[in-house]
Amino acid sequence: MDYRSAGVDIELGRAFVKGIRERVEGSQAQSSGSSGTLGGIGGFAGLLELPAGYRAPVLVAGTDGVGTKLEIAQQWGQHRGVGIDLVAMCVNDVLTVGARPLFFLDYIATGKLEPEALWQVIDGILEGCQEAGCQLLGGETAEMPGFYPPGKYDLAGFCVGIVERADVLDSSRVQLGDRLWALPSSGLHSNGFSLVRRIVAERGWPWDHQPPGWDRPLAEVFLTPTRIYVQAVQRLQAAGIPLHGMAHITGGGIPENLPRCLAPEQAARLEPHSWPIPPEFLWLQEQGQVETLEMFNTFNLGVGYVLVIPPEAENRLRSLLPEAFPIGEVVPARPGESRVLGLEEWGSLVP
């Protein structure tokens, strides 16, 4: 008896890590500037030299996963997008305090190492890191036979960023009357998929079903990768736009995430129907007979990221990010009431 007969192929794992190292080195060669990495992939730990120019640097850490969106990717056989999702979920969180992503680590757990699928995941992770301007510094691939069924895997990601202490964004910067501007999502991103899967299953739709008016089947629309907002925010930072706060709209939707960048005595007042709801959300609401407030509490509904800025910065923000749109303002919180006001005035998602 040996380890391979127990379900763990050491040689295949070694070849997989070698391939990752080659891909990372190729990705670094294509990127501009110094990576700051010391050594390479495959050691016990990854090393990265802190960039110069910081007077009082603060390191910022975040971790996340992709959730049950992975189930659709594994059924549909498309895995690259969830690699991008993994990076996006972590770097977008780190970004909310004003940090620049520095490096990323991944964890892949699977019942049986299947390189064809996992290469797609790694390529997606590298693509996400390149877009976010950070390095893939290391990771872990765990082959766990008997724990995960064949063909199944789970992902976790870890990101560390850096920000000048004086530039850290927290709720103390947010003022009453500040305006809320949204950056559009690319779709469902990586949240709400347990409800998505239940709706699709109970309605009996196959993943290759293409609803009327759609240009792609359900699986491809729902697997659209999470948008990475690093470059958009860095454009604002470089232009000196006074960012008072930022919120990444993930699990729990706007009601759960927007208050996280506000002070306890503050609330967000949303203007009803201030943006069009993308069709995939309207389809899910109709197919699942989901109430409007439940939709807000589950999905991003087209708002992937929220910027809190003073009113005098609105015109400059609009010129720098034409895709951004205003959704409301910061108002006093009402004792015993929701920290996100105006949702009850929406009624239907369609005006």
UniProtKB/Swiss-Prot annotation:
The answer to whether the entry has keyword Glycoprotein is no
Q: Where in the cell is it found?
A: Cytoplasm
Instruction: Give the molecular function GO annotations.
Output: ATP binding; phosphoribosylamine-glycine ligase activity; phosphoribosylformylglycinamidine cyclo-ligase activity
What are the TM regions of this chain, as residue ranges?
Answer: none
Q: Which GO terms describe its biological process?
A: 'de novo' IMP biosynthetic process; adenine biosynthetic process
Q: Which CDD domains match?
A: PurM (cd02196)
> Recorded E.C. number(s)?
6.3.3.1
UniProt keyword annotations, A-Z: ATP-binding, Cytoplasm, Ligase, Nucleotide-binding, Purine biosynthesis
Highest taxon above the source species: Bacteria
**Enzymatic class:** ligase
Q: In which pathway does it act?
A: Purine metabolism; IMP biosynthesis via de novo pathway; 5-amino-1-(5-phospho-D-ribosyl)imidazole from N(2)-formyl-N(1)-(5-phospho-D-ribosyl)glycinamide: step 2/2
Q: Which reaction does it catalyse?
A: 2-formamido-N(1)-(5-O-phospho-beta-D-ribosyl)acetamidine + ATP = 5-amino-1-(5-phospho-beta-D-ribosyl)imidazole + ADP + phosphate + H(+)
What cellular component terms from Gene Ontology apply here?
A: cytosol
Q: What family is reported?
A: Belongs to the AIR synthase family.
PANTHER family registered for this protein in UniProt = TRIFUNCTIONAL PURINE BIOSYNTHETIC PROTEIN ADENOSINE-3, TRIFUNCTIONAL PURINE BIOSYNTHETIC PROTEIN ADENOSINE-3-RELATED
> What is the recorded name of this protein?
Phosphoribosylformylglycinamidine cyclo-ligase
From the broadest rank down, the organism's phylogenetic lineage runs: Bacteria, Bacillati, Cyanobacteriota, Cyanophyceae, Synechococcales
